[in-house]
Regions:
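A short glycine-rich, Lys/Arg-flanked "PGG" loop and its adjoining helix->strand segment in the class I
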Residues: 155-167
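N-terminal, positively charged/glycine-rich alpha-helical extensions of SAM-dependent methyltransferases
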Residues: 1-44
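Conserved alpha-helix/loop element of class I SAM-dependent methyltransferases that forms part
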Residues: 48-71, 86
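A conserved beta-strand element that flanks and buttresses the S-adenosyl-L-methionine
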Residues: 143
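Class I SAM-dependent methyltransferase SAM/SAH-binding core
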Residues: 81-130
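A C-terminal cap/extension of S-adenosyl-L-methionine-dependent methyltransferases
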Residues: 207-208, 219, 224-230, 238-302
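Conserved class I S-adenosyl-L-methionine
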Residues: 70-79, 171-200
Length: 302
């Protein structure tokens, strides 16, 4: 396992030098904010929150927005405010703070929260500095969904998150999962072999082009053990809670037989797919975890 993790790190280091920045992540996410509706009222906003989470069965159980009553909550990488709405509707936090690199996302969050008669402290940070203008030890819960895998310097972000958390404070985070059908069935087989797209570039670079637009400057994926090691290096204690799977991945399941039968598909991917079994919900399991793209973790500051 350590050899595989070390190999992934070396590959990513090489890829980072080739990534198209086009003004950096902040500029990219301002131009390509996560898809949203033109919400007309609080009901349509809440329905969008519920609909979006339903696209990833199991996600909301792994990354809950309830049970945050009386807490100081930070949504790190809040985007257009989906989870800010979730916390404001399904919890009663003492204070709610949204942080993002995109001013457009923060402005959208403000307008969306206003539909609910709610507000939050909204803070723009610089992507290359990652400095959070909050006091050390002032936050109970940091929530970060689908953000750190886009960070140019995730270590700097983790260091700041650790600093602002109170002792015993919680950090719940979702990042893209290498051990997923998205990687082993969609990218490795459907995209590169069936369709013949991105088949001449490194696998991790092909993955990057499939998640948040083909020109997304940074989009890592991690094996759970690799991400645990990364975060624990910054003082956290925690665990891999499990993964949520996308409906898109579930729709691809019938292709698994052709993938296993393909001599063109590297053995790593064939073996991963051949180990699939199913849980009571009908979701594919590999290595005792749902083989979905959203890997979810829970950490605490000692």
């Amino acid at each position: 396992m350590k050899c595989v993790i070390s190999g992934l790190k070396r590959i990513r280091a090489g890829l980072r030098a080739k990534l198209p920045t086009r003004g950096g992540s902040a500029a990219y996410w301002t131009r390509h904010m996560v898809a949203m509706d033109d919400w007309s009222d609080s009901n349509s906003s809440t329905e969008h929150f519920l609909w979006r989470n339903a696209q990833y069965p199991g996600y909301i159980d792994l990354m809950p927005v309830s049970f945050a009553d009386g807490l100081v909550v930070v949504d790190y990488g809040c985007g257009p405010g989906n989870d800010l709405v979730g916390f404001s509707e399904f919890s009663k936090p003492d204070k709610l703070i949204g942080i993002d690199v995109s001013p457009t996302a923060l402005a959208t969050s403000k307008k969306r929260l206003a539909l609910h008669g709610k507000s939050a402290d909204l803070i723009q940070i610089e992507e290359n500095r990652n400095q959070i203008p909050l006091e050390s030890g002032s936050v109970d819960l940091v929530h970060s969904s689908g953000v750190l895998h886009h960070a140019e310097n995730p270590g700097a972000a983790l260091s700041e998150i650790y600093r602002i958390l109170k002792p015993g404070g919680k950090f719940q985070v979702m990042v893209y999962n290498y051990d997923s059908l998205w990687m082993h069935l969609y990218v490795a087989y459907v995209l590169r072999i069936e369709i013949g797209k991105h088949d001449r570039m490194p696998l991790l670079d092909a993955f990057r082009k499939t998640t948040d637009g083909p020109n997304c400057p940074i989009s890592h994926c991690y094996r759970p053990a690799e991400f645990l090691e990364l975060v624990q290096n910054y003082g956290f204690q925690g665990r891999f809670k499990g993964a949520a799977i996308s409906l898109f991945e579930l729709e691809l399941l019938p292709k698994r037989y052709a993938a296993i039968n393909s001599r063109a598909l590297p053995r790593e991917h064939r073996e991963f797919i051949s180990r699939i079994c199913f849980n009571h919900a009908g979701h594919p399991i590999v290595n005792d975890a749902v083989a979905g793209v959203d890997a979810c973790f829970e950490f605490r500051k000692p």
